Amino acid sequence: MKFETLKIADLISEISMGPFGSNIKVECFVDDGIPVLNGSNLDGFVLKEGSFRYVTEEKADSLGKANAHRGDVVITHRGTLGQIVFIPQDSNYDRYVISQSQFRVKCNEKILPEYLVYYFHTRIGQHKLLSNASQVGVPALARASTTFQKIEIEVPTLEYQHKIVDILELFRKKIETNNAINDNLAA
């Protein structure tokens, strides 16, 4: 199997940082609307639904590229570094607003978003992702979107990516099922 070494910039069609913190103030939150992501939603490989705060559709519209959609990949650049998830096609919402501590990418036709996320959960992927981390004060990735785009990764053919993702998804779903069973037993 032949892998091609490509920069992230060659694998994505869009990258966008979260809004400035002052763009989402406490008074912007409402009881229902467009969910705003936080670190607890970025635990694991797939976006975790729940524990959302919401903004109105108008507020989300005003935040433009800080809106993430199904198929997008969301990465934490400040706080709990190393978090990276994809938003599945069957997510509960059509769109989400990323926080000021996150950025999002839209993959192009050369890579599956699931493959990209699984890659960055490997030891080498985490090393590459965290290589520009600053530990002074709040942990952060220096120039997050710029440095992320310069990372080089090994990319197989799309056919092989599909095979890898299919196998890893089977394991991920089995683990989720087992965890749900364990949670029910503990209750």
What are these language model-derived features?
Residues H121, L130-S131, E154:
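Well-ordered mid-protein domain cores that form the structural environment of catalytic cofactors
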Residues G33, S51, S99-S101:
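A generic structural signal for short beta-strands and their flanking turns/coil linkers
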Residues M1-F20, E154-A187:
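Non-catalytic DNA-recognition/assembly elements of restriction-modification systems
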Residues T5-V26, S40-V73:
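Sequence-specific dsDNA recognition surfaces
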Residues R95-F103, S134-V165:
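A short glycine-rich beta-alpha junction/loop motif
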Residues N38-G39, E57-G125, G137:
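A short beta-sheet element
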Residues L11, L37-S40, N108, P156:
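Structured loops at beta-to-helix junctions and adjacent beta-edge loops in soluble globular domains
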